[in-house]
Structure formats: structure tokens, C-alpha cells
């Protein structure tokens, strides 16, 4: 399983935004939508072994978590408007501290970064930062990872402190700063290659002899 967390510092936490203006009315929700697509879509299908967690910290009620489960997800297309619509529907629910299903494969709850980190107890956490250790030196060792990325604002000092206290390893996908969705694509590529070298089909299945 691969879990990917994206922190949206300005992402709106109510559903009253326009799907025609995701960058403006929704607080750069377009960035999160692109991350959802990069994390989940293949050329002719979807990564069923991936979960995406969007941490929304914008107004009016900062601290909501929307989870996209690749295994159960339906009604998602690769365009930003499609993922934006599923996010909007989730935010229109009456949200509590417990997971509430919005649509198949999409769940919403109240929570913050510590809430997410607690849910990943026992997992290996990786925090992406430009000056981190190159993933190419680690990709063959990575199993059942959780990756945490910031949005266009990066990660705050307090968030970084929480990540490091939780034991997150700082890694990088390259020497220059990239958009979050591009980082996700590169992460998948490195892990896919490592899995293929181990005789696995990305997704956790073993290649049969002769295939």
C-alpha cells in the first residue's frame, strides 16, 4: 500500500466554492486536484493500492481530512473538475471526528496533521523536501510507505517539527523544486521500477514465471 498526504494550507473547508474557479474561490484546490489525479491514475486504469489524504486547512473550519481510496473509488475522472466535484460533495456532509463516506471510495472527517500521523502508527513516513536524501538510494528498501508533501506554500516549521517527531525521513525526488503533483509522479515511477525489479507488478502482485 502507498499512502500520500498533501497539505492544503489555503484549501477551503466548506463546499460553497465554484468548480469553475478552483484556484481562487476554493483556495488553490486545483493543486490538490492535480495531486489526486497524479497519485491515482494510470494510462488505462487506476492504482488500487494507493490512498490519497487531503489535509484542508483553509477557512471557514480549518482541519478537515478527505481520503480517496484507490481500491474502492468510483466516479473519478482525470480532470481537475471531477476530483474537485468529489471534494465538494465530501465537504457538504455534516463532518465529525469519525470517517463519513461521501461517495464510493471518498471519506471525510475532522482532523489535523497529528490526527493523520497517529493513523499511520507503525508505518514508514517520508517527508519530501528538496534537500532530502535521494529516493534513488532508498527505493529498493521502501515497503508500505506514507509520503507527506506540502502544497505551493510548502510545509510550515510547526508541521515539519511534527513530522520529524513522528519519525519521518526526509527524502527528495531531485535537486530542484517541483510541483507537488510532479513529485508524486516521480515517486510512483521510482517505486514501480523497484517493484518490477523484485518481480512484482506494481500494486503488490508477483509476476508469474514466464511472464
Swiss-Prot record:
Q: Which family does it belong to?
A: Belongs to the methyltransferase superfamily. TrmY family.
Q: What is its EC number?
A: 2.1.1.257
Gene Ontology terms describing biological process: tRNA methylation
Under which name does UniProt file this protein?
Answer: tRNA (pseudouridine(54)-N(1))-methyltransferase
Cellular compartments annotated: Cytoplasm
Gene this chain is encoded by: trmY
> What CDD domains is this protein classified in?
TrmY-like
Source organism per entry reads Methanosarcina acetivorans (strain ATCC 35395 / DSM 2834 / JCM 12185 / C2A)
User: What's the subunit arrangement here?
Assistant: Homodimer.
Q: What top-level class of enzyme does the UniProt entry assign?
A: transferase
| Purpose | Specifically catalyzes the N1-methylation of pseudouridine at position 54 (Psi54) in tRNAs.
Question: What would you give as a GO molecular function for this chain, any one?
Answer: S-adenosylmethionine-dependent methyltransferase activity
Q: Where does S-adenosyl-L-methionine bind?
A: 128, 150, 183
Instruction: Enumerate the PANTHER family for this protein.
Output: TRNA (PSEUDOURIDINE(54)-N(1))-METHYLTRANSFERASE (PTHR40703:SF1)
